[in-house]
Amino acid sequence: MSEFKSDFLHTLSERGFIHQTSDDAGLDQLFRTETVTAYIGFDPTAASLHAGGLIQIMMLHWLQATGHRPISLMGGGTGMVGDPSFKDEARQLMTPETIAANIASIKTVFSNYLRYGDGPKDALMINNADWLLGINYLEFLRDVGRHFSVNRMLSFDSVKMRLEREQSLSFLEFNYMILQAYDFVELYERTGCRLQMGGSDQWGNIVNGIDLGHRMGTPQLYALTSPLLTTASGAKMGKSLSGAVWLNPDMLGPYEFWQYWRNTEDADVARFLKLYTTLPMAEINRLSKLGGSEINEVKKVLATEVTAMLHGRAAAEQAAETARKTFEEGALAENLPSVEVPAPELESGLGLLTLLVRAGLAASNGEARRHVQGGAVRINDDQVSDERRVIGSGDVTGDGVIKLSLGKKKHLLVRPV
């Protein structure tokens, strides 16, 4: 559909969120005439979501901002199975205790983007364990399982890929798409939910839910998927050279999060402003026209706006100021990430390679050695070329810390304790 008339779909379309819908015209009409309830599922595979999942949270944010009701569905039940979609092998099964702990940790992020409550447009957080854990297997087979064609399930790309590669697909995993389809019907029965959204890799699972709803007598249900994003150079969103870009502040602080977005490739800046900030389109269009050295200022705007939504405006501005002092003034910014080292250990002397690994700037002594040999390591802004260098209490500055740097963009403070 060339142009949506409903606020929600128009907003998503102009900002680049829409990859595919099950019925452009029907869904647009639904949003123009009703307050729509829609959901996205989040499986608790880790204690935090990472930046790759932020596009889904932003879709829920815009749903509520345009007057509709979002549901963030926690996969307490489906997480016990694991989504096999486009995976080369089965996920390692998690214990119920791990799943519960991950959900408790994950859900803290959502209130930064959504308003939860009891009102008709307030967001809901629901756990599919509420209905999946109590299912009677024989009744489920009779009432739900009979509506699924194995022939059709085998035709979905996510399944076909595993089979064509002769990679094992367990019966447990094969059931995941049935459970996800059932979630859609159950959410309609409980909340009147008519739309499921997700990444484009979820298309088959979502369409299964629409078909199941049709066979079980629900009104027309709908699907909307977003593109699977990569950076301009082909890297996965939410991954950096240092690892996953976590959303939970106890797993990645505001400064490191800000830096991830500040380091966005030039070709991605305009696209990311549309997807990950709430800046008006007119302002985004203005910023997108800037080039040359001004693109770096636009990247700072991007980093600050994205960080402000997750960590709050004060933390975002503090991260920006820390970066400014570090990179533009060369000053020692007290809000840089830090690692604590026992003072007696420093007094005895700590090997540089060991410190680089402990600080998370290298994964191994071998990698640390390559960084030193490549001239990338500095202590208190002085380049270090000797991999046998020992760091001691004499390296502690008047500020009571040691500044450890890797390249131009990674800095942290070593604090004796």
From Swiss-Prot:
The keyword Translocase does not apply. GO terms for cellular component: cytosol. NCBIfam families: tyrS. Gene3D superfamilies: HUPs, RNA-binding S4 domain, Tyrosyl-Transfer RNA Synthetase. InterPro entries: aa-tRNA-synth_I_CS, aa-tRNA-synth_Ic, Rossmann-like_a/b/a_fold, S4_RNA-bd_sf, SYY-like_C, Tyr-tRNA-ligase, Tyr-tRNA-ligase_bac-type, Tyr-tRNA-ligase_bac_1. The keyword Cytoplasm applies. It catalyses: tRNA(Tyr) + L-tyrosine + ATP = L-tyrosyl-tRNA(Tyr) + AMP + diphosphate + H(+). Catalyzes the attachment of tyrosine to tRNA(Tyr) in a two-step reaction: tyrosine is first activated by ATP to form Tyr-AMP and then transferred to the acceptor end of tRNA(Tyr). It is an enzyme of class 6 (ligase). It comes from Rhizobium meliloti (strain 1021). Homodimer. CDD domains: S4, TyrRS_core. Residues 350-417 form the S4 RNA-binding domain. Keywords: Aminoacyl-tRNA synthetase, ATP-binding, Cytoplasm, Ligase, Nucleotide-binding, Protein biosynthesis, RNA-binding. A motif ('HIGH' region) lies at residues 44-53. Pfam families: SYY_C-terminal (PF22421), tRNA-synt_1b (PF00579). It is found in: Cytoplasm. ATP binds at residue 239. L-tyrosine binds at residues 39, 176, 180. One of its GO terms (molecular function) is tyrosine-tRNA ligase activity. This is Tyrosine--tRNA ligase. A motif ('KMSKS' region) lies at residues 236-240. HAMAP family: Tyr_tRNA_synth_type1. Its EC number is 6.1.1.1.
